[in-house]
Amino acid sequence: MGADASAFSFRTKTMSHPNLPMTEVLVVADCWQREPDSEAVIQRAVAAAAESVDEDVAEAEVAVMLTDDAGIRTLNSNWRGIDKPTNVLSFPALQPEGEWKEGDAPRMLGDIAIAYETMRREADEEKKPFDHHLSHLAVHGFLHLIGYDHENDDDAEEMEALETQILAHLGIPDPYADRPGTH
C-alpha cells in the first residue's frame, strides 16, 4: 500500500456472536493510530448492518482493511481503473455454487478497504463526527458485499434508505439529510 506493510503494527479483532459475521479489522497505515476506537466502531457498524438485512450472514467472515490514501489509490487503480483515492472500496467474495451448511468452513463475504485521509477530510468538510462517518462507510461497504449497489437512482435510493435505517439504530443521524435531491 502506501509503504512497506511490515512497518506497521497489525491489530485484529473479531466478533463471535453466532448470528453475526466474524469481522477482522486489519490496520495497515499508521495514520489510523490517531483514532484508537476505529476498530470498535467498525465492529459495531458491521454488526448493526448484519442484524438489519435479510441475508444469512451468520458464521460468515468480513475483512476490513484500514489503509491510507496511497493504499486505496493503488487498489482503486488496479481494480477499477480509477487512479485516485476514494473513501471506501468493497470487494465481494465470489462464492462457489451450492448451499453453505453449518460446520462448513466460514464463508467469506469479502473485503472492505477504508482510506483514512479521504474519510477524515469528508467528515471535517461535512462537519460530521469521525466515528459517525466511519460507521457510515463500514455499513456502506458491508451492503456492497451482500449485493447492494448504487448504479442507478432506484438502487441508490434503496441502499441509502437502508444505510440511514442502520445508522439510526446506532444513534447516528441521516448522512444524506443535508444533501439536496436525496430521499
Curated annotation (Swiss-Prot):
Uppermost EC category: hydrolase
Subcellular location: Cytoplasm
A GO term from the CC aspect: cytoplasm
InterPro entries: MetalPrtase_cat_dom_sf_prd, YbeY, YbeY_CS
Gene3D superfamilies per the UniProt record, alphabetical: Metalloproteases ('zincins'), catalytic domain (3.40.390.30)
E.C. no: 3.1.-.-
Family affiliation: Belongs to the endoribonuclease YbeY family.
Primary role: Single strand-specific metallo-endoribonuclease involved in late-stage 70S ribosome quality control and in maturation of the 3' terminus of the 16S rRNA.
Key words, A-Z: Cytoplasm, Endonuclease, Hydrolase, Metal-binding, Nuclease, Ribosome biogenesis, rRNA processing, Zinc
HAMAP family membership: Endoribonucl_YbeY
GO biological process, one term: rRNA processing
Name of the protein this chain belongs to: Endoribonuclease YbeY
Binding site for Zn(2+): H140, H144, H150
